[in-house]
Amino acid sequence: MKDSKKNGFFSWLSSKIKKKKTIDIRQNNTDKNHDINHEDLYTKKDLLIKQDNPKKDEIDTLNDHGKDIEKAQNTKNNFFLRLKKSLKTTKKNLGDKIYQIFLSKKIDEVLFEELEEKMLLADIGINTTNRIISNLIKDVNREDLKNSEKLYFLLKRKMFNILKKVEIPLEISSHSPFVILVVGVNGTGKTTTVAKLAEKYKLEGKSIMLAAADTFRAAGIEQLQTLGKLNNIPVIAQRSGSDPAAVIFDAVKSAKSKKIDVLIIDTAGRLHNKLHLIEELKKIVRVIKKIDISAPHEKLLIIDSCNGQNTIQQTEIFHKALNLTGIIITKLDGTAKGGVVFSLADQFQIPIRYIGIGEKMQDLGHFNSQEFIESIFT
C-alpha cells in the first residue's frame, strides 16, 4: 500500500482508546429452515391417537406431513454437503488463506494489509474489500480489540451479513402465467439452468411451458426441445433465425390461453458490451407487456462464477437495461473465484435466487448465506 494510504487508512494504530466494550462475536443461526420442530408434530399426533374415536385419515395426514418434513430436511442437508464439497477450491483460495492470517497474530497494519491482499486475490473486489476492512478497523477502535481470533469471527459475521441481505428465495405467485425471463452472456449455462428450473417447478406440481427465444443458435433451440420432451414440458419455438420477440409473443399468448402456471423464457446469450443486443432485450420486455402489463414477473440473470470480476460489469449493464429481480450463480463447483459472490451481493443487492454446483437438477439449490459461509470458512 502507498504511504498516504497507510497514514489515513490505518491511523487508528496511534490513537488511544479510552472506553472498552465487550464484543459479542457469537454467530446466531438465522436459517429458519433448520428450526423444524418435529416434537410439536408428533405431540399433535399422540393427542389425536388418545381420542376415543380418532380418524385414520387424520393420523395418516400427520404421518405424511412428518415424512414430507423429513424428506425436505434430508434434501436440504444433502445439498449443503455437496455445496461444501463443490466449494473446496474457493475455501482453499479464500477461507483457508484468510484463516491463516489470524493465527497467533496481533492486530496491526500488517494483518490488515495481508487480509486485503487475500480478499482481492479471491475476487471479492476492491470496493467490497475496502468497505469490509474499513468497518473492521472501526470496530477495533471502538472495542479496543486485541484478540485476532475474535477479529476473525467478526470478519465472518460481516461477510455473512452481506450475503444475508440477498438471501431471498423466488416465490412463484398464483398469477397465470408467471413469466420468468432468463438472460445472460454466452456460456453461463443459461439453457441448462432453464431446464433445471422447469423440472424443479414441475416437481412442485406446477404446469410449465418453455419458450426457445435463443433463435440465433439452432443447437440451443434443439437442446431446449429435447429437454422439454424428456420432462414432458411443452416448448414454443420457431426456426433458427426467427425474431425472438415473435417467439415470445406466441409463447405468452399460448401460456395464457392454456392457463399455464409458469412460463420460462430462454433468451440468446449476448455479450454485455453489444449494446444493440441489450436493446433487443428491452424490446422483448415491451412485447411481453403488450399481453400482460405485469410481466415479466421475474428477470433472472445467469452468472458464471468462473468469470470472477467480469461478472460485475455484466451485472451492471443487464441491471441498468432490465432492472433485474434475481440472479442465479452457476458453476460454483471447482471454481477458485467464489469470492465474487460477496462482491455481487454487496454492490447490487439483487436477490440471489439459486446457486448451481453441477449438471444435475438437484445441483441447483436455493441460496443460503449461512451454508455458504460455513462451506468456505473454517
Curated annotation (Swiss-Prot):
Catalytic activity as recorded in UniProt: GTP + H2O = GDP + phosphate + H(+)
Membrane topology, from the record: Peripheral membrane protein
Subcellular location per the Swiss-Prot or TrEMBL entry: Cell membrane; Cytoplasm
GO CC annotation, single: plasma membrane
CDD domains, sorted: FtsY
PROSITE patterns: SRP54
InterPro entries according to UniProt: AAA+_ATPase, P-loop_NTPase, Signal_recog_particl_SRP54_hlx, SR_rcpt_FtsY, SRP/SRP_N, SRP54_GTPase_dom, SRP54_N_sf
Pfam families, alphabetized: SRP54 (PF00448), SRP54_N (PF02881)
Main subcellular location: membrane
Family named by the database record: Belongs to the GTP-binding SRP family. FtsY subfamily.
Function, as annotated: Involved in targeting and insertion of nascent membrane proteins into the cytoplasmic membrane. Acts as a receptor for the complex formed by the signal recognition particle (SRP) and the ribosome-nascent chain (RNC). Interaction with SRP-RNC leads to the transfer of the RNC complex to the Sec translocase for insertion into the membrane, the hydrolysis of GTP by both Ffh and FtsY, and the dissociation of the SRP-FtsY complex into the individual components.
Protein name per UniProt: Signal recognition particle receptor FtsY
Organism: Buchnera aphidicola subsp. Acyrthosiphon pisum (strain APS) (Acyrthosiphon pisum symbiotic bacterium)
